[in-house]
Amino acid sequence: MENEYWKCSGHGTFVKAADGKDYYLYHAYNKKTNVFSGRQGMLAQLNWPAKNVWPVLKEKSGPSLNRDLKLNFTRPQIDKNWQWDFRNSTPGILQKNGQLHLSGIINKDNLSGIALTVRPTSTTFEATTTVTNTNSALKGLVYYGDAGSAIGIGIAGNEIEFWKVENKTRTVFAKVRIPTTVPVELKMKTADDLNLLVSFRKPNEEWQNVQAKEKITVNFLPQRDRSPRIGLLFNGSVSQDADFSTFELKY
């Protein structure tokens, strides 16, 4: 099935609802974000117009929901939206007293670190977090495709760092030394053309952009079945951790 908004539908399952109606639960790619945002869940009703004819699938639109996500880590249970790359790291995740503590073991060939992420429903979004601890590990935000394709902003010691990993090479676009360290808020914002802006601030102060020498795009991140995720980053030793008090994703 294809319409004005969706394409390449398939790989679905027929289900019967409590009211006796038949539905097709499947996936498709959004035409606007193309393969960058990956497959998304779809639902269509199965109708039989008459005997001995092909069935008809009619898409069903659900209610419009607020897709924004805001987490403050007040409960011990981690949010069900979190995902991580188990092939390239073994994260340790602890929520306590309004803090999420992220640590763990990073595979030797993993240059990106541990990424605790959620799957965005659009290529354009604004993600923010608050880092609350100080050490030499890099702690912050990451837009993560896999261990060899990621980009982010973080703080290590008293330096803000804007970085990416591509083709097994880690590049630092810019560093900004700040007089005091934590807490510090970090932000990543993507645009329709896949350009990326990153910034930081102390709580209740103005945002300061971290400028690279050229425009930075995220179009190198994996697509289709490995569509990139946005979330929290820890890149340090097993004796360190990254502490966060907030994470927010807005569309």
Predicted segments, located by residue:
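Carbohydrate-active catalytic/glycan-binding domains of CAZyme proteins
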Residues: 1-251
